[in-house]
Amino acid sequence: MSETPDSPRPVTPGSQASFGTYGGRPVSFVRRGTRLQGRRQAAWEEHAERWAIQVPRHVANTSVHPDYTFDAEAVFGRKAPLIVEIGSGLGDAVVHAAEQNPDKDFLAVEVYTPGLANTIIKINSRGLTNVRVVEANAPEVLESMLPEGSVSELWVFFPDPWHKARHHKRRLIQPAFASVAAKALVKGGYWRIATDWSNYAVHVREVLTGSTEFENMHEGERSGEESPLTQVWQSGVESVVGGAPVREGRAPVSTEHTGPNEGVDEEGGWAPRFDGRIRTSFENKAHEAGRMIFDLTYRKR
């Protein structure tokens, strides 16, 4: 069974969002809304006890007490491959995957409470039993909540790109995060990543190329003129954030590539679209803005 500490430290609502740090380290999110209304409120009150993992907190409202361990076999009532999605949003991807893969179990990790409520609504409407949700800070989930080598796949789709240079330290995928991801994954487990920003795609590729714990499953593929990065650089579609006209009175935010004709991506390493990743409303907005989607797939050595 899961181990629950006797007396978790009190929660400090909003502390992580306010200061942007936890345990002296930057966090990758801002909690923009936690209030529930209507269907979301009703779903949370009626079903959260069953579908939401009630973790003991540590020092903040999304922290996980370091003594707590998630026992997937006890929670799901069986031993099955566990897939974890970090930043599950409204739950479209994880719920679809759970429906298509009844032989696997899924854990949706999110800090946006309305998104988790939406996920619970979808779980109930489809009669699924192989999905759970947890409101928690992702690095803590991977570092201490999940047992070492317990995750068969890790998904991070469209993380916040944190465009401004002074905010790059808040990007989720950093060397330290790669280390805790490797700790949670089984040997040979997959880490699937998608982003609609070329600058973040390059950042991810650099971080994981520098990791000795992962190998790129598509090393050298889709390079040169076939690279989506080359296409973005040469088109100049990301000359300002959004690839669209800047609103009146607002300054453009550079993504560090102003195009056109900036060069050719000779490194490549981009994966084909993962069949299990459905096109969500969030991704649709990226396409409408003219941005390209970058997929990367790594395997734990």
UniProtKB/Swiss-Prot annotation:
<protein>
    <recommendedName>
        <fullName>tRNA (guanine-N(7)-)-methyltransferase</fullName>
        <ecNumber>2.1.1.33</ecNumber>
    </recommendedName>
</protein>
<dbReference type="InterPro" id="IPR003358">
    <property type="entry name" value="tRNA_(Gua-N-7)_MeTrfase_Trmb"/>
</dbReference>
<comment type="function">
    <text>Catalyzes the formation of N(7)-methylguanine at position 46 (m7G46) in tRNA.</text>
</comment>
<keyword id="KW-0819">tRNA processing</keyword>
<dbReference type="GO" id="GO:0008176">
    <property type="term" value="F:tRNA (guanine(46)-N7)-methyltransferase activity"/>
</dbReference>
<feature type="binding site">
    <location>
        <position position="110"/>
    </location>
    <ligand>
        <name>S-adenosyl-L-methionine</name>
    </ligand>
</feature>
<dbReference type="InterPro" id="IPR029063">
    <property type="entry name" value="SAM-dependent_MTases_sf"/>
</dbReference>
<feature type="active site">
    <location>
        <position position="160"/>
    </location>
</feature>
<keyword id="KW-0949">S-adenosyl-L-methionine</keyword>
<feature type="binding site">
    <location>
        <position position="137"/>
    </location>
    <ligand>
        <name>S-adenosyl-L-methionine</name>
    </ligand>
</feature>
<dbReference type="GO" id="GO:0043527">
    <property type="term" value="C:tRNA methyltransferase complex"/>
</dbReference>
<dbReference type="InterPro" id="IPR055361">
    <property type="entry name" value="tRNA_methyltr_TrmB_bact"/>
</dbReference>
<comment type="similarity">
    <text>Belongs to the class I-like SAM-binding methyltransferase superfamily. TrmB family.</text>
</comment>
<feature type="binding site">
    <location>
        <position position="85"/>
    </location>
    <ligand>
        <name>S-adenosyl-L-methionine</name>
    </ligand>
</feature>
<dbReference type="Pfam" id="PF02390">
    <property type="entry name" value="Methyltransf_4"/>
</dbReference>
<feature type="region of interest" description="Disordered">
    <location>
        <begin position="1"/>
        <end position="26"/>
    </location>
</feature>
<comment type="pathway">
    <text>tRNA modification; N(7)-methylguanine-tRNA biosynthesis.</text>
</comment>
<feature type="binding site">
    <location>
        <position position="164"/>
    </location>
    <ligand>
        <name>substrate</name>
    </ligand>
</feature>
<keyword id="KW-0489">Methyltransferase</keyword>
<feature type="binding site">
    <location>
        <position position="160"/>
    </location>
    <ligand>
        <name>S-adenosyl-L-methionine</name>
    </ligand>
</feature>
<keyword id="KW-0808">Transferase</keyword>
<feature type="region of interest" description="Disordered">
    <location>
        <begin position="244"/>
        <end position="270"/>
    </location>
</feature>
<feature type="binding site">
    <location>
        <begin position="280"/>
        <end position="283"/>
    </location>
    <ligand>
        <name>substrate</name>
    </ligand>
</feature>
<feature type="binding site">
    <location>
        <position position="196"/>
    </location>
    <ligand>
        <name>substrate</name>
    </ligand>
</feature>
